[in-house]
Amino acid sequence: MTSSAPGNADGQSRLAARFVAGPHVRAPDTAEHRLQDWLAELEPSLAASLRDQFASGWARSILLGIVESSPYLFDLIRADAQRLDRLLRCDPQTHLAELIARTGREVFACSGEADVMSLLRRLKSEAALLIALCDIGGVWPVMQVTAALTDVAVAAVQMALRHLLRQEAARGRLAPIDPAQPELGCGLFVLAMGKMGAGELNYSSDIDLIVFFDPDATTLAHDIEPQPFFVRVTQALARLLQSRTADGYVFRVDLRLRPDPASTQVAMSTEAALHYYEREGRTWERAAMIKARICAGDVAAGEAMLAELSPFVWRKHLDFQALTDVHDMKRQMQVYRGHSEIAVEGHNVKVGRGGIREIEFFAQTQQLIAGGRHPELRVRPTLQALDVLTASNWITAQARDELTSAYEFLRRVEHRLQMMADEQIHSLPDDVDGVARFACFFGYESRERFATDLLFHLDIVQGHYARLFEGDPTGTVSLPPVNYGAGPDEPRLLEHLVALGFRDPMMVALTLQQWLAGDYRVFRAEATRTTFNEFLPALIDGLAHADEPDRAVVAFDRFLQALQLGGRLITLLGQNRDLVALVALVLGAAPRLGDMLARQPRLMDGLIDPRFFGAIPDKRELSTRLAATLQDAGSYEEFLDRLRLFGQESLFLIGTRILSGTVSAQQAGTAFADVAEGIVHTVHNLVIERFAAQHGRIRGQETAIIAMGRLGAREMTASSDLDLILLYDFDADAPDSDGERPLQGAHYFARFTQRLISAFTSRTNYGVLYDIDMRLRPSGRAGPLASHIDSFAHYQEHEAWTWEHMALTRARVISASPAFRARIEAIIQTALRRSRDAQAIARDVADMRRAIAAEKGETDLWDLKHAAGGMVDIDFVAQYLQLVHAASKPEILDISSLQVLDHAERLGVLPRADAVILRHAARMYHDLTQILRLCVSDKFKPDQAGDDLLRVMTRAGDAPDFSALEARVRETQSEVRRVFTALLER
């Protein structure tokens, strides 16, 4: 059965005998049972062969670890047991080379696209399993793993492109020089960028490609226009590689690193590209081109273009602007990423502090600085760059060795994370148990041992990164003596401001003159003026470090004008000068937060608190802080005002962390919800006591607050209102309250609810707590404000519309006695778990989506909630899946759409490909929505937005620039709408 397999080996050269490592299995009995169940389903001789393979040392541990921790790899194993047997008996390096070569021959022999797609996907599946086994089993070092992944990707792109060009030649549109190699002289070439270009692909990586063509050097038929022809070929190439079929996909293709992707075609002429890079090319594009490599197509045309691009990437002189660009890249990472504490749970090993990106940036920065004059630095792989930098005496051998060790460790962590579900993720689980499970899959016996090694490497990387510029480790400069109050007529001041990076030095000089004149309200106190004058040079330097220095000055000026008592704040900034750039970011990108800081300067205390950039406080810590805030409140009004201040401070601090990039959207949404939940529970209890003091209590009374919508799902934003339902119960035999001003039954609870709403929405000098929306109560506006629990149960069973049960999937009791909570949760579960007609629910959900589109519109790309393919589509898919499947699969139920998608995939009611698309989209929408809700009060219009906001959004969307982000959003919405339509509008 296996003797003729490619790469077949005997004895100690076979893969199963070469394993030297493996996972630590947490529940071996459970994993063993699942493995044996699968083996029992196989043909007996095949099962016996596999059992023989598993007897080899680490082989059983690896298979059990996969069974326990990697649904993706176990799916590959179960899909083709003979393939696993073949791989365990092969010499892996020989097998992979022969697999690629054989697939190339088979693709060449094909004429049909479907057959080519199937062959490429079978290549990817077999290679993915083989490479994973070599990685998990320690057979290959991690950089051999990345090289193998890259070889597969390059081969797949080459095979797909060659097939497409041969098809075009058969149609008479191309006259190739060599029919067997139609890419020769065709004019089109494909650049592999990023990790693919450097031979460093990660396990579940997208492939970043740029496609160019030389219209003056093609083999096209005389009547064929180059641009539309090559655009069509490029689109077909992407489709061949990334379309999901029954065999899966080959690689997700990202074409957005091309110049101005939002407004250019997927294939660009070399002339247009060179024109763009010459006139508009940015530092990040220079850095990206360091790793660019021709991976397919017309190699000669590609080499000619890269030669022309060389002066753009490799500057011959370290001119002032180049140094400024390098410093800006470094400072931007410090401002947006650098304040976050190194952590274990939730830490992003790619872009988090001490992560892979910092190692890559460490190397690329010095390559950009010196590569023009030192050609030996022009290498693509990160570790090779570190070697060359060491040989050239740019870094020490110790730095090279420590960074190499850290890079290899972090890349292995990244791979193991991605192997679990074939998703391009980089963050460790958010909870301790999740990290413990991952640590075992990674081969550690405990979370603690893994955490020790992880933190060691992260600390090492952080230290080297911080010392990147030895003469200027903090990003500050020596400030020369300058008369900052001299005004715009002083040449020395203007020269100094230009040197700092200001583009409008006259405006800045005039503003400084106004500050030093002391006419602003905040400067009335002499002590404040003195402190500010001493702080001004450092302030100007700090503002110069902002992304847009001139805008930062304008924003800070507006802030100073709004301040009333700002002496302490100015003192704090003077003592914590590293926060100036962060405050400038807040003022420029989120005027709402700036206004809050101007009204309440004490909010700055939270930024200085060492805990600010640490872990987000959990519910218990929030409860402790809330209790301390409310201690000794002298009156009901003071109590509510302290709550308002607590809410504003929480919003400000969480919002600042969103802008600085030190919390994820999910963490922010949970934090906003935890704050709101704590406040709701506190206000609920306060109003109960206050109301009882006036009207007494009814025997057996109970009240509960149910959170719906974003609060229920724990996905709140800075501008979320609270969707609430209030339920009550009492002894029907004694409906009157026992107070001085008694009320009866339903009237008592209606008045109570009005008092509760008033506590939240009454406006004082400190604003409001929250806006309240109770329209999701039974019968909506037509129903009473508060509902009896029996009425609620009857309504959900007999009267509720489908959309109301959709909303109920997010219902969460957030304030009630334990017994009353349990009764309500039972009612909700009963309503959600009842049997439903899938087609009827699909029609209802689709009708509801169309109704929302008619009311809200769905054509605004940046209405991430309501746009076609936006968050509503994803939420509706999740809610549909719950309503249809909860009767037979109650474990699908969850308040979070992301969790529902995970459950649905695991339960087999949502294809993995669709789940991946929806999960990735939801995470991106959450990331961007958090920023938009924080920074924009109306519709977001990019052409009217400030550069600070666009820059923050670009980073949140993990895009190189806003144009690329816009293209990504558009493509994502198209994919989501396709999934929605296929599922609900069949």
From Swiss-Prot:
Ranges for region Adenylyl transferase: 478-986
InterPro entries in the record: GlnE (IPR023057), GlnE_rpt_dom (IPR005190), NT_sf (IPR043519), PII_UdlTrfase/GS_AdlTrfase (IPR013546)
Record keywords, A-Z: ATP-binding, Magnesium, Multifunctional enzyme, Nucleotide-binding, Nucleotidyltransferase, Transferase
Cofactor(s) required for function per UniProt: Mg(2+)
EC numbers, comma separated: 2.7.7.89, 2.7.7.42
Class of enzymatic activity (EC top level): transferase
Region (Adenylyl removase): 1-473
GO cellular component, as recorded: cytosol
Source taxon at top rank: Bacteria
Listed GO MF terms: [glutamate-ammonia-ligase] adenylyltransferase activity; [glutamine synthetase]-adenylyl-L-tyrosine phosphorylase activity; ATP binding; magnesium ion binding
Catalyzed reactions per annotation: [glutamine synthetase]-O(4)-(5'-adenylyl)-L-tyrosine + phosphate = [glutamine synthetase]-L-tyrosine + ADP; [glutamine synthetase]-L-tyrosine + ATP = [glutamine synthetase]-O(4)-(5'-adenylyl)-L-tyrosine + diphosphate
GO biological process: regulation of glutamine family amino acid metabolic process
NCBIfam families found in the cross-reference section: PRK11072.1, PRK14108.1
Function: Involved in the regulation of glutamine synthetase GlnA, a key enzyme in the process to assimilate ammonia. When cellular nitrogen levels are high, the C-terminal adenylyl transferase (AT) inactivates GlnA by covalent transfer of an adenylyl group from ATP to specific tyrosine residue of GlnA, thus reducing its activity. Conversely, when nitrogen levels are low, the N-terminal adenylyl removase (AR) activates GlnA by removing the adenylyl group by phosphorolysis, increasing its activity.
Family of the protein in this entry: Belongs to the GlnE family.
Protein name, as recorded: Bifunctional glutamine synthetase adenylyltransferase/adenylyl-removing enzyme
Native organism: Bradyrhizobium sp. (strain ORS 278)
Gene it is expressed from: glnE
